[in-house]
Regions:
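C-terminal transmembrane helical bundles of large multi-pass transporters
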Residues: 324, 636-910
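Hydrophobic transmembrane alpha-helices and their membrane-interface caps
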Residues: 23-28, 345-352, 357-412, 857-910
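Signature of alpha-helical transmembrane segments and their immediate interfacial
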Residues: 1-32, 432, 485, 498-546
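Juxtamembrane "pre-transmembrane" interface segments
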Residues: 181-183, 191, 260-262, 276-348, ...
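Helix-loop junctions and hydrophobic alpha-helical segments within the transmembrane domains
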Residues: 321, 332, 408, 414-438, ...
């Protein structure tokens, strides 16, 4: 075959050129993303049932649903968190499970239970988590002072953002969705005059009935006239606030308009949450891309739209934040520059060793050709350009150069002996084909057990394994098919300047002679490396994934008090103004509940806030975070505050925030976790010094109102009337919706706000005869402590406490055994990332052993010897010890990425 190729150089070069063209085309069409497009093995089920308390929701809906979803194939774990009116179940699967099939099966299991759920409950929402669910970036839309001076309101900005900005962005083909939060909503409020209602013997139910009777929409009708059929549209009675005021109510054959007995007004309100940007109220937009979109192009197109909108609307400011395109650009540019520098240095070293420009040129040409054609292989294999596949290409560059040097050096040696260059090329190439194939197999052999790793590690390594394998196959083909042709073309009339690097050979021969003359000493030093390597393994810090430095972070605050939205905003702004200057950082905050559809922040309570801080100076991170922490705990000592990394794709997939060690407590006596159980557990933990301070942020202080049905029956008051009265008294009773062309407004009944006891003390309720009685005669109020949320897994309810002052689970278990928890009917489970890390490193050890066995078998087959492969494999001991030593010296950790590198290099060095 080699003779056939070197005799047809034009055909070979044209074939290579065609492959290069296809490779360039493949590169321009490959998706570019930070990480491989993994199916994250997690499905979230969200349940909304406003008005039902957490305990009833857990018992009647969530518990049966959790038991049903446990039957979904491949479920590894299921956890639920239930609070008043809402719940979220998270199903975790192994990476070998198809999340598409699991998603379908989850929906089927939910459909089977819908018949037993209460009527009127929305169908649970099933969400499949994907890397593309992370917003590419956020847009903050802030009105200037001139905007308000022009007489415009925040509601107008909300309408403009929804109808113009959001739509303009979603028109881009690369954008899949734009989520929005921080809007003002218009609402029509009806505030009845209770004195007039009592005088006219009217009840709230009369007002509700009148509104619903007049606010109808029966759609389009049709009628026939001869041969023609016409559509008939019935116009609604209510289209404006004035129409609501003119609604008539019959009273003893007399009519009274609603506007005469109630104040009707249109208001704008933010709901239960707002968004601020650099201290001013703003609107936040989360921009999501399509799965296959090239992320680096999205930012440029968005910038054009932002400039157009701002030029037409100078009174609003649109700013990008949490820009993932910058993270991608930085990561990709870093890897590409590393690849280019590595290739350049390798070629320089080849030239210094060979001291022949033409031979160096052959290597310089063959490696880029292999890289370009490798992109065609990635396109066929369905692999995107990401940091994992690019790191695989960087690995491959050295191997490509090795293959080229081996072929060239062997041909060169035969060329020095043979006068016929074709014979030299033929003999030199055929001699090394088998060793090159064997070398490729030993390198690829370590990939087979690595792919079998459980969890994220195995899934991530698939891209790297395919990339390196494709690159090695392409490099092998280029080495045995193209390099001989290039050698003949470039070296046919040039043999005089082919020299060897004598200095390196002299140094190598002297070193080898020294080792052979003192073989016992060097053997002793070699065997001493084994205990050194073991010691370094225990000394090197271990973590699941490497630390990723960021110039931004989040601050999550729970005030542990039932503060209002206004008070929540006041506290957040006070903290930020006291600790953050405009020169140090840019900040934004979601205060209370957010209205994002795809984010868990929407589960945030009204007394919580999440602050995002983007640093302008990296060195300020520690001082800034500690300043926020100290100020908050000093001024609001009961609050719970957490400093968390900013959420990006790495945080979503790697989940580094998981506690190292936590204790999960279960009540084996009653199977229910309540506030008394939590306080008892906290007291035991404090006594045993497992925690330094009890944190009761999992408890809510609230009031319970109990209706006395016997008294209602005695005085002729219906349960519906008192429930309606309470809804109006303690909140807003949504009666109906007023539909317009492209929007809808809630029609609600409310009252002037007073404190709890004044409301109960001064309010009245009428019976069916029109007699009025004090509301306090029919209800009882008491103050209680309840769980903020009920947390469960497949074993039932639990209370989880992070343990920060314990290094290993073994020490923690011995501490638990010496406390009353061991014998008091309390179930205790130890969970955390440390345990997961143990499992992972045990798997890595197993993979390393399997890889060594495979390497031994391949080498034994190649050398037809059982002893020689053992001698060769002893080199790995020295290499692993050296790798651990450098990790220790440079204060790095042994993690998934470094462990993968060690195992892959074990195959490469052989």
């Amino acid at each position: 075959m080699v003779r056939f190729l070197i005799e047809r150089p034009i055909a070979v070069l044209m074939t290579v050129l065609a492959a290069i063209v296809l490779g360039i085309y493949a590169y321009t069409t490959l998706p570019i993303s930070l990480l491989p497009n993994l199916d994250i093995p997690e499905i979230t089920v969200r349940i909304n049932y406003p008005g039902m308390d957490a305990r009833n929701l857990e018992n009647t809906i969530i518990k049966p649903l959790r038991n049903q979803l446990l039957q979904v194939g491949g479920v590894v774990n299921i956890e639920s968190s239930t609070s008043d009116g809402m719940s979220e179940l998270v199903l975790s699967f192994s990476y070998s499970v198809s999340t598409k099939l699991a998603f379908i099966e989850t929906n089927e299991k939910i459909d089977e239970l819908m018949s037993i759920f209460p009527r009127g409950m929305e169908r649970p929402m099933v969400i499949k988590v994907k890397p593309s669910d992370i917003p590419v970036f956020y847009l903050s839309i802030t009105p200037t002072k001139d905007y308000y001076d022009a007489g415009k309101s925040f509601k107008e900005l909300s309408d403009f953002s929804t109808s113009v900005i959001k739509r303009r962005l979603e028109q881009l083909s690369d954008i899949s969705m734009v989520d929005i939060s921080g809007l003002d909503h218009k609402q029509i409020e009806i505030i009845p005059n209770n004195e007039k209602l009592a005088l006219l013997n009217l009840r709230y139910s009369d007002i509700i009935t009148a509104i619903k009777r007049n606010n109808f929409n029966i759609g389009n009708l049709s009628f026939r006239d001869g041969y023609y059929t016409y559509r008939l549209k019935v116009l609604p009675i209510i289209t404006t606030t004035s129409h609501i005021k003119n609604i008539k109510i019959n009273i003893n054959n007399n009519q009274v308009s609603l506007g005469e007995i109630a104040e009707i007004k249109t208001t704008n309100h933010p709901g239960d949450g707002i968004f601020i940007y650099n201290g001013s109220r703003a609107i936040s937009m989360a921009v999501y891309k399509h799965m296959d979109a090239r992320i680096e192009k999205i930012g440029e197109r968005i910038d054009v739209i932002i400039r157009d909108i701002q030029s037409a609307n100078p009174n609003i400011i649109i700013e990008k934040e949490r820009d993932q395109t910058q993270l991608l650009s930085f990561s990709m540019d870093n890897l590409k520059s590393t690849l280019a520098i590595g290739l350049f240095l390798a070629i320089i070293i080849v030239f210094l060793i060979m001291k022949n420009f033409r031979l160096s040129l052959i290597v310089s040409v063959s490696v880029p050709i292999s890289l370009i054609i490798a992109f065609l292989g990635l396109k066929i294999a369905g692999i995107s350009i990401n940091i994992i596949s690019l790191s695989g290409l960087i690995f491959s560059v050295g191997l490509m150069i090795d293959n080229s040097i081996i072929i060239i050096d062997n041909i060169k040696q035969h060329h020095g002996i043979q006068s016929d260059i074709s014979t030299a090329i033929l003999m030199g190439t055929n001699e090394v084909i088998r060793p090159l194939i064997s070398s490729m197999l030993t390198t690829c052999a370590v990939f087979i057990p690595l792919i079998s790793l459980s969890g994220l590690s195995g899934a991530l390594f698939w891209d790297q394994a395919i990339t390196i394998s494709v690159s090695l196959v392409v490099s092998l083909l280029i080495s045995i098919m193209v390099i001989p042709v290039l050698y003949k073309l470039l070296m046919d009339h040039n043999t005089s300047n082919i020299t060897h690097s004598s200095h390196l050979l002299i140094i190598y021969e002297r070193a080898l002679e020294t080792v052979l003359n003192h073989r016992k000493v060097f053997l002793l030093l070699f065997f001493l490396l084994i205990p050194l390597g073991v010691s370094l393994f225990f000394l090197v810090e271990k973590e699941q994934f490497p630390f990723i430095e960021q110039n931004e972070f989040n601050v999550k605050i729970n005030w542990s008090e039932p503060v209002t939205l206004a008070e929540n905003r006041y506290r957040v702004v006070a903290i930020l103004k006291s600790t953050v200057s405009d020169e140090d950082a840019i900040y934004s905050a979601n205060i209370g509940k957010s209205s994002f559809q795809l984010q868990k922040d929407s589960r945030q309570s009204i007394n919580e806030a999440t602050i995002h801080i983007e640093l302008l100076q990296k060195r300020k991170k520690d001082s800034l975070s500690s300043g926020i922490l100290n100020y908050t705990l000093t001024n609001y000592p009961g609050s719970k505050i957490e400093i968390l990394p900013s959420k990006n794709i790495f945080q979503t997939i790697f989940k580094p925030n998981k506690e190292s060690l936590s204790l999960r407590f279960r009540n084996n006596t009653y199977d229910v976790i309540d506030h008394q159980f939590i306080r008892y557990i906290d007291s035991l933990l404090l006594d045993s010094k497992l925690i330094n301070k009890a944190n009761h942020t999992s408890l809510n202080e609230l009031y319970e109102l109990e209706i006395e049905p016997e008294r209602l029956l005695m005085y002729g008051i219906s349960m519906d009337d008192i429930i309606t009265r309470l809804k109006i008294l303690f909140g807003i009773l949504e009666v109906d919706k007023l539909q317009r062309s492209n929007s809808s407004y809630n029609i609600s009944i409310t009252e002037e706000q007073h404190n709890l006891f004044n409301k109960i003390q001064n309010s009245t309720i009428s019976n069916i005869d029109g007699r009025t009685y004090p509301l306090r005669n029919f209800v009882r109020i008491r103050k209680v402590n309840r769980l903020k949320s009920i947390v469960c897994d497949q074993s039932g309810e639990f209370y989880e406490v992070p343990i920060d002052n314990m290094k290993t689970p073994d020490i923690l278990q011995s501490k638990i055994n010496n406390t009353p928890m061991a014998t008091s009917g309390i179930g205790v489970d130890i969970v955390g990332s440390i345990l997961e890390r143990r499992v992972l490193f045990n798997e890595f050890l197993f993979v390393l052993i399997i890889s060594l066995i495979l390497l031994y078998l391949i080498l034994a087959a190649q050398f037809e010897s059982l002893l020689l492969p053992i001698i060769i494999l002893l080199e790995i001991v020295f290499d692993i010890t050296g790798a651990l030593l450098f990790l220790y010296i440079f204060n790095s950790s042994l993690n998934v990425m470094s462990a993968l590198g060690i195992i892959v290099m074990s195959g490469i060095i052989i």
